[in-house]
């Protein structure tokens, strides 16, 4: 939604800055509606929550893998590459045929779906951010993306550290500091003090690990919250 920081930044402000054309679907994205819309629009960049790719994967790919000649061919090692190319083209065509990159965020990606998309060299990358960071924290081009990660944090624009004795192997809370970190919640000093410390570090509430090159991996939440597949935050 454009009312969200992510939607405002990447579906509105970024296209305005570069002269991009934006298409807002305006309807619930069922696989049928999505495929029909993509055939007309033929987008070059798609920013979406994981559920969009997962729906198309289940609709377009799984039936081929689970039955028919292709399911048999997949079991023959020498045919794998050819089969992957066929599936990749079918998926790309389902999204209009012109997509150069899929930027996914807002919720965890199903590991089975992510693993398969990377196996067929689908142009996918997963980013990470939050409203309080306006909103991007990490992003990596698809050709540099590491499986199960959410990209490298934006070095030069912000600092990120893991509150852990061993940030690479032991999960700790992800802390962020930089110019585009918020100054505080509007007229809510109590909540502001809970997430922003005296040194300017934003305590995200997300638990993660980080590679030496700055690649982030989300491992869970330090707060009680359910994050649904469509990006909705549910507080039980």
Language-model segments: residues:
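Short acidic loop-to-helix transition motifs that present clustered carboxylates
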Residues: 28-33, 109, 132-133, 234
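Adenylate-forming
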Residues: 54-60, 102-103, 111-115, 132-141, ...
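Short gly/Ser/Thr-rich phosphate-binding loop of adenylate-forming enzymes
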Residues: 74-122
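Active-site glycine-centered loops adjacent to acidic/histidine catalytic or metal-binding residues
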Residues: 106, 129, 151, 206
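Active-site loops of AMP-binding adenylate-forming
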Residues: 109-111, 115-123, 130-148, 165, ...
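Short Gly/Pro-enriched turn/cap motifs at secondary-structure boundaries
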Residues: 148-155, 198-199
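Conserved ATP-binding/catalytic segment of the ANL
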Residues: 161, 166-228
